[in-house]
Each structure stands twice: as structure tokens, then as C-alpha cells.
């Protein structure tokens, strides 16, 4: 399932889509404005689709602004006219804009009608989405030739739609997440936590400056943890969980990603979701911090002593169990959401 941005088409836009599917238009340019899909340009056909293509499509593409273009072919299938779906995401556009358009792509296809879309073309430069670029794309689909960079990026976007989060990689960018720089004091606080000189570090994203900054390092006991979770904004939390398990005293680092539902803006939700994995990779690889559990919550009320203990020591992995105990009643606390790393997922599969 792709990441949901909450952006939808208005009734006016849906009416334009209906007229387009009936053959009235050769091209539609769609943008995202004020968290809505809007049609910025409609063009009726002038000639054959090949003769219309470059003169219709290329002038609409801006150097620093992503958009979608729906271009109608002259061919039809059982549902009506067939269309090319063009996702334009230029190299010099803002990372946040790229993420937003990538996250909303599946929504637009659904609103327009996926059965009408014959081909999808993804481009970062105009050559990718020109008529020549489209024909190269068709050739690549019918042969085992290596994919172009743009085609490979489209393939990765499709893979991510089937998985969970939307993505784009660092501030140098791949499709695995956005690695915003970590401020010096935030990094130093994480170092102190790894050495157990601190027991709690809270980080936030400075959206304006695209940086992960330090928010809180207040000494925190387990009973204090719920009070550290903001009710109106997202945060990352690293907590040194001190507890006993089967007679052993343990100090385990737990990562908590708090996202208070839809009280946060779409942009904030997307940024926190996309920056999460690269941040954890830095913490685990560069700082050699062993993050024992990764948890996602909506609010601090979930962080009870029993909840945290059960997350760190799931009953199905409990040791020294002399006989198989019957399962407790289902749904006692609802479904817990864990952010599983690759190693955990592999262990679960085994």
C-alpha cells in the first residue's frame, strides 16, 4: 500500500476527468495546490497523437516544479481511449515537492481510472518524456535492454507503492528515505545516549531548514515517558529502557516514532515518515547503537510499563518456557505497530 497523503480530486476535477475519458481532450496537466489536485491546463486534440505530442507536452514542463501530465493516444481499449501518464519530477525541484508528488501518484491514477492508462513515463529531464523518450521507453519494455535512470526510478516507485512508505533517499536522494542533516548538538546527544550518559533524546525536524535538530534530553524515567510525547507534532524518541527480564538487569535502547494522526500537516507526516529509516541507519551504523525495538505510536498514553515490556520481550519469543501456555484473549491492547528492520523481518520469517 502506498503512503497516503490525503490529497484528492475535487468534484470539478472529476468532471474534467470524465470529459477527458470521453475523448474531449488530448492533454491534461495536473498539479497539487493547497493540498488538492487541480487541472492547470486542458488541450483538445489538434492532429494525430504523435504530431501533437512534443508541442503539447514539453512547453508545460517547468524546470523546478513537478507535475503530472495525462496525454491521450488515438487508440482505445474496452474502457475507452488509452492514455499515457507522465510523472514529471525535475532534478532541481524541491525534495518536499518530489516526495509529495511521488506519494500522490497512485491517488491520481485511481481518480482518473487506471484502466485507461496504457503506459507510465517518469522523467527528470525533458528528454525522458519527449516523444523520442517515450518511444525509447516502449522499446525497453519489449526488450531486455538495461533501464534508463528515469525508468529505474519509476520501477522503484512502483515497488514502494506495494510496500509502505513513500521515499526519496538522502538530501542526495534515493527512493529509500530522506536523510536530512543531523545538527551537531543532536548528534552529540545521541553519542551520549550510546555511552549511557543520557537516558532520553528527543529529535524533531526543522522543516524550514530541512535539518534534524535536538528537542529534549531531559532525564526521563519510564513513568515520565508519556509526558514527553507532544500531542500536536511528530517526534523521534530514543529511550534507554532500564528493566529486569528473567532475573537479568537490562538497559535497552528503544526508538519511538510518535505521530499524532491527522493533527499534523501532510508535509510533516511525509517528512517524518521518510526521514525515519535514514536516521536509524546513521544511529545504528555510525554510532554502533543497538536499537532493540522500533515502535510507532499515536500518543503517549500507549507507553505503559506493560506495553513497553511486551514490545521489547514479545511473549512468542519468551525464554525458559517449560510448557506451551494457552494464548491470552485477542485484542487486549489492539494491534501494535512495529517498525521492523530487515534483520527482525528475516528472523520472524525463519
Curated annotation (Swiss-Prot):
One of its GO terms (molecular function) is protein-containing complex binding. It comes from Mus musculus (Mouse). Residues 317-350 are annotated as: Disordered. Residues 2-139, 175-313 form the ADF-H domain. The modification N-acetylserine is found at residue 2. It is found in: Cytoplasm; Cytoplasm, Cytoskeleton. One of its GO terms (biological process) is barbed-end actin filament capping. The gene is Twf1. Disulfide bonds: none annotated. Widely expressed with highest levels in brain, liver and kidney. Also expressed in heart, lung and testis. Not detected in spleen or skeletal muscle. Belongs to the actin-binding proteins ADF family. Twinfilin subfamily. Phosphorylated on serine and threonine residues. CDD domains: ADF_Twf-C_like, ADF_Twf-N_like. This is Twinfilin-1. Interacts with G-actin; ADP-actin form and capping protein (CP). May also be able to interact with TWF2 and phosphoinositides, PI(4,5)P2. When bound to PI(4,5)P2, it is down-regulated. Interacts with ACTG1. The modification Phosphotyrosine is found at residue 309. Keywords: Acetylation, Actin-binding, Cytoplasm, Cytoskeleton, Phosphoprotein, Repeat. Actin-binding protein involved in motile and morphological processes. Inhibits actin polymerization, likely by sequestering G-actin. By capping the barbed ends of filaments, it also regulates motility. Seems to play an important role in clathrin-mediated endocytosis and distribution of endocytic organelles. The keyword Phosphoprotein applies. PROSITE patterns: ADF_H. The modification Phosphothreonine is found at residue 349. One of its GO terms (cellular component) is cell-cell junction. The modification Phosphoserine is found at residues 143, 277.
